[in-house]
Amino acid sequence: MACCTGRCTLILLCTLQLVAALERQVFDFLGYQWAPILANFLHIVATILGLFGTLQYRPRYVIAYALWAAVWVTWNVFLICFYLEVGDLNKESELLTFHVSQHQSWWSEHGPGCVRKEAPVAGVAELESHSYVSVIGCNVEYQYIEVMHSALQILLALLGFVYACYVTSVFTEEEDSFDFIGGFDPFPLYHVNEKSNHLLFKQSYLPA
């Protein structure tokens, strides 16, 4: 297929998804966000699988990628609800760290314009190095940065899902048409040649 088709568009989308996922994975590692780290890892694996399937004309791999894209959209919708505190969700909770640490998003202290100040906690020994961290002057609150990340992931995943379905249908049609004309199966050609030779042999022995 030419590069202007849905196949090459899906390759481009998978590449963009890999770049966006790797960028997000770095900042989630910096913020010790273990649930997003695990989800990002699975997303990277599924995207590589979809990219391989698209390059190698493997519709089953592309279908697996499309199914994951639906799961990925659901996960990012949950993240948007989490950071916007929809319902009983609380962005200050330890849900995304599996309750093993009190870390928040890396952007909560390192966002655009944020100034991080530390003050020692009164009554705590200096050797324990406990301090109170305050962040002021942020141009954009960290939850909105996370929401924008998730919105971008949703957009790419939806486009990827649509093109994955299209590419899968194209691959399937090509396989069906290829099988119809014989494909790599040598039997039809061999069978025709054998039948022709048999007829010629029979005609040569007909009485004059």
UniProtKB/Swiss-Prot annotation:
Signal peptide span: none
Family: Belongs to the NKAIN family.
Localization: Cell membrane
Subunit structure: Interacts with atp1b1 C-terminus.
A Gene Ontology cellular-component term: plasma membrane
PANTHER family per the UniProt record, alphabetical: SODIUM_POTASSIUM-TRANSPORTING ATPASE SUBUNIT BETA-1-INTERACTING PROTEIN 4 (PTHR13084:SF5), T-CELL LYMPHOMA BREAKPOINT-ASSOCIATED TARGET 1-RELATED (PTHR13084)
Alphabetized UniProt keyword annotations: Cell membrane, Membrane, Transmembrane, Transmembrane helix
Membrane topology: Multi-pass membrane protein
The keyword Phosphoprotein belongs to this UniProt entry's keyword annotation: no
Top-level taxon in the UniProt lineage: Eukaryota
Principal localisation: membrane
Species of the source: Xenopus tropicalis
Record-linked Pfam families: NKAIN
InterPro entries referenced in this protein's UniProt entry, alphabetically: Na/K-Atpase_Interacting
Record field: transmembrane: 10-30, 35-55, 62-82, 151-171
Protein name: Sodium/potassium-transporting ATPase subunit beta-1-interacting protein 4
